[in-house]
Regions:
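Conserved acid/base catalytic micro-environments in cytosolic active-site loops
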Residues: 2-9, 15-30, 36, 41-56, ...
């Protein structure tokens, strides 16, 4: 934001929450709350009047819910939106509508819960201020009869901000006959299981949240739990999954680096690594380790990334063999599997 304060519009039908959010985020000197709104219609007027850089928006509101509001708003007023929600699958609908990120609503009675919420939303506002607004162009579903696929590989994917929607678009474009896929998405606990169930229902692949003792098999996708690292262990010709609690790595648990480094070590040239949109540098070092051990590697390009952070660092250090748009990644991946 070039040293200027980030202008934020806070939208929530609860006066109490509007005040908690507005006062809390303004404790950060780089953020200025330019307006508050009680409903989407009020918010639309405030957007025109104040031209905010970022909007925070409750999912559950009267007159029009936050998801419908985002769906209608963004084509006319492209604006980074962070949705605030109780623990519910609605956050993924909001991301699909074009929101950049989400934060879980705190218990107002718990000062610890509110404090954690404010730290989280301040961090996400700063990321959102530099984010690109996604247009909902999805990758085309790939014809599953488009040639023989080598399923004796392992695919490892890492993502952060903007990643839930990017992963959905990527997996939706893949046929059922695929090698086993491992995913680390920076996501809170509980939501990781919801995310896995949603992908399982919306794609041709068998998707679940990973558990220690799971075996990676073709057609199966395992997503790291929101508060546990994930790594693999090769036992004979099979791949066993381990998830475990641990210190944050690069500020994250689960960490993409933890997965990628174990894949480099255990699978070597039998793997393909994919780095998708996200803030920071988690996974760059691990992707480089994979490439050095003979793995093929793909990075999402700047144009199609909501936040070109993790893929940029990976590209800059030489970890990315092929950089391309999100829409083109399925084709590149399938070509590598021929």
């Amino acid at each position: 934001m070039n040293g200027k304060r980030i202008k934020v519009l806070v939208v929530d039908d609860s006066l109490l929450f509007r005040e908690v959010i507005a006062r809390g985020i303004e404790t950060d000197p780089s953020i200025e709350v330019v307006a508050r709104a009680a409903d989407p219609f009020d918010a639309r007027d405030k957007i025109l009047q104040f031209e905010p850089d970022v909007m925070t928006c409750d999912v559950e509101m009267p007159k029009m819910n936050g998801i419908e509001f985002i769906r209608r708003l963004l084509p006319q007023h492209p604006l980074p939106v962070i949705v605030i929600s109780t623990v519910s699958e609605a956050v993924f609908d909001a991301m699909n509508a074009g929101a950049v990120d989400f934060v879980t609503k705190p218990e107002v009675q718990s000062s610890k819960s509110v404090e954690k919420f404010l730290l989280d939303i301040i961090s996400k506002i700063k990321i959102a201020a530099n984010a690109k607004i996604s247009r909902s162009n999805t990758a085309d579903t790939v014809n599953s009869s488009a040639g023989k696929i080598n399923t004796n590989k392992i695919i490892a994917i890492g993502a952060s901000t903007g990643g839930t929607e990017a992963i959905y678009k990527l997996l939706k474009a893949l046929p059922a006959e695929m090698p086993g896929i491992l995913i680390v998405q920076h996501i809170p606990p509980v939501f990781s299981n919801m995310f896995a169930q949603r992908l399982n229902n919306q794609t041709l692949l068998n998707v679940k949240e990973a558990r220690t003792g799971d075996w990676l098999e073709s057609g199966k996708v395992l997503i790291a739990p929101g508060d546990r690292h994930m790594k693999i262990k090769k036992i004979g010709d099979r791949i066993r999954i381990e998830t475990f609690e641990g210190e944050k790595v690069n500020g994250h648990c689960p960490s993409v680096d933890v997965l990628f480094e174990s894949v480099a070590r255990e699978a070597g040239s039998s793997a393909i690594g994919i780095m998708l949109t996200g803030m920071g540098y988690d996974g760059a070092r691990g992707l480089l380790a994979m490439r050095r051990r003979g793995a093929r590697t793909i990075g999402q390009d700047e144009q199609s990334s909501i936040v070109y952070g993790m893929p940029k660092v990976a590209f800059d250090i030489g970890a990315v063999e092929k950089q391309t748009s999100l829409e083109n990644i399925p084709q590149v991946l399938l070509a590598m599997l021929k």
